[in-house]
Amino acid sequence: STTASNVSAAFSQMGKRVAQIGCDPKNDSTRLLLGHICRHTVLDLERERKGGEIGAEEIVNVGYNGIRCIEAGGPEPGVGCAGRGIIVALEKVRQLEALGDTDLVLYDVLGDVVCGGFAVPIREGYAEEIYIVSSGELMSLYAANNIAKGIRKFASRGRVKLGGIIGNSRKVAHEEELLREFAETIGTQLIAFIPRETIVHDAEIHRQTVLEYAPQSTQAEVYRRLAKAIETNEKLTIPEPMVFDELEEMVERYGN
């Protein structure tokens, strides 16, 4: 979500009309754009109104630099299915035409494709390009590989393709080289490698993106370059996921 919000902020600084939709029950995708946790998610309003009318303006919160922020929300703790909630929420967004006149919509989706609900932006054609954020840690790469499997499964139904891997550094040994080989092995590219810097944490404490908190910083420029790389990216592919044993061997090789 930190990467997603900074990319949204970078696109908005490029003059794009941007919307970001958080597809995670935690409701925290747009926190850095709004300066607070979203107080009214789509599913919150659905529960409150019990089938009554909801206005588009009620589910859209305008954040940094005019970015339209929407949180799908989730079920009450211990009740219902979060994945199903995302299906309901995105359908409501579509019905209400809540995105307005936007140039770019960013869907921030939970990392693991744990059920069909979380794959809705891929499966139902909401998204055209998928970017996977991953570190060089084994379980992060495992999740990335699972998402690649999901993209491959649903790519035949529409135009969705994988645009690349966004490296999100955890300071693992030889991390950038590992991520680059992983990306190339599954048939895509390492479109950016984001270093782990304390300024990102400092900005989060102030409930801001790096683009807002420190717009002249080197880290802000990293996110701007990523946004430009996404804007001009023409390498969109259907991935060829790895088998786990091969992935594990690759990680071990770079760790030695």
Descriptions of predicted regions:
Residues 13, 88, 95-104, 109-196, ...:
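Conserved catalytic-core segment of NTP-binding enzymes
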Residues 218-236:
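Extended, charge-rich low-complexity interaction segments
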